[in-house]
Amino acid sequence: MNYWLMKSEPSAFSIDDLQQMPEQTEHWDGVRNYQARNMMRDQMKVGDEVFFYHSNCETPGIVGLMEVVRESYPDHTAFDPQSKYFDPKSSPDQPRWYMVDIKYLRHTRRILPLAELKQHEALEHMPLVRKGNRLSIMPVSPAEWNYILRLEDE
């Protein structure tokens, strides 16, 4: 099993939105960065666990846990001219972009703010806390995952 962190602006799609979806499951669409796409397409597997991270908001941070319940498949929003994620170079025959389905597991017991995560030496190598890393999807090591879960109770 792998661990991940996936970012979303809560004004676009929040942990509460995911919790309210039918079966608390939704596809994670709109990823338009090749490195993030490659991780989602090539490495994410059913059963992988994911931190849900709220970005571009008053208190950016980890707000919940999700699970990958369907491995990558073509992102249909890339084919829709009415979608903000439309890509004229992507087609059903030759898709350029992919998505996975994720399922809500739970909210974290408290928001784990980015500012707090940056203060922990044990997380200094985590892509999230390093300068210049703006990927919307990133791997989390098992040690980082377990450390962050322990922070919920502090």
What are these regions (language model features)?
Residues 1-46, 144-145, 152-154:
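Compositionally biased, charged N-terminal/linker segments
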Residues 44, 60-62, 79:
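Short glycine/proline-enriched turns and hinge-like loops at secondary-structure junctions
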Residues 53-60:
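Short, charged beta-turn/beta-strand-edge "cap" motif at the junction between a beta-strand
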